[in-house]
From Swiss-Prot:
Heme c binds at residues 62, 65-66, 117. It is found in: Plastid, Chloroplast thylakoid membrane. Belongs to the cytochrome c family. PsbV subfamily. Residues 1-25 form the signal peptide. It is a peripheral membrane protein. Coiled coil: none annotated. InterPro entries: Cyt_c-like_dom, Cyt_c-like_dom_sf, Cytochrom_C550, PsbV_cyt_c550, PsbV_cyt_c550-like. Binds 1 heme c group covalently per subunit. The lineage of its organism: Eukaryota, Cryptophyceae, Pyrenomonadales, Geminigeraceae, Guillardia. GO terms for cellular component: chloroplast thylakoid membrane; photosystem II. Gene3D superfamilies: Cytochrome c-like domain. This is Photosystem II extrinsic protein V. One of its GO terms (biological process) is photosynthesis, light reaction.
Length: 162
């Protein structure tokens, strides 16, 4: 019995080493990868590479405070679609999220919060933002908008899910 399980374990382990994509990838169709681009209602289809890059960069640069789409410093505001669309200006498309990551403002849009929120504008205070290009910010924005399609109510849902 032990020999059968050890042989099966060895086979699975070898497959994971030879082709790690068998374990870690999911195929997302174009409809799933389609996210809002701008306020005019245009959309963009993220490439699989942009999806991977966005996830990696979000986890490295934003995930400490926004794990699962929540905001640890302000539990009343998350990254779920409703909260993004009700912000002023609305942050429910990639261009608006890129603008926010460059120059963050309060939820009502009246005050700059660059000194307390990581951004390109405050890269001297928040070193994680220093090396991010516009393409990186685009991928992060795409990741934020893609997550509600993949995690549904869990994204931005708060403590009850995490």
């Amino acid at each position: 019995m032990f020999k059968k399980f050890s042989a099966l374990f060895t086979l699975l382990f070898t497959l994971c080493l030879v082709n790690p994509m068998l374990v870690y990838s999911i195929d997302l169709d174009e409809n799933t990868r389609s996210v809002p681009l701008d306020d005019a209602g245009n959309t963009v289809i993220l490439t699989p590479e942009q999806v991977k890059r966005g996830k990696r960069l979000f986890n490295a640069s934003c995930g400490q405070c926004h794990v699962g789409g929540i905001t640890k410093t302000n539990p009343n505001l998350g990254l779920e679609p409703d909260a993004l669309s009700l912000a002023t200006p609305a942050r429910d498309n990639i261009n608006a999220l890129v603008d926010y990551m460059k120059n963050p403002t309060s939820y009502d849009g009246l005050e700059s919060i660059a000194e307390v929120h990581p951004s390109i504008k405050s890269a001297d205070i928040f070193p994680k933002m220093r090396s991010l290009s516009d393409e990186d910010l685009f991928a992060i924005g795409g990741h934020i908008l893609l997550q509600p399609k993949l995690s549904s109510e869990k994204w931005g849902g708060g403590k009850i899910y995490y």
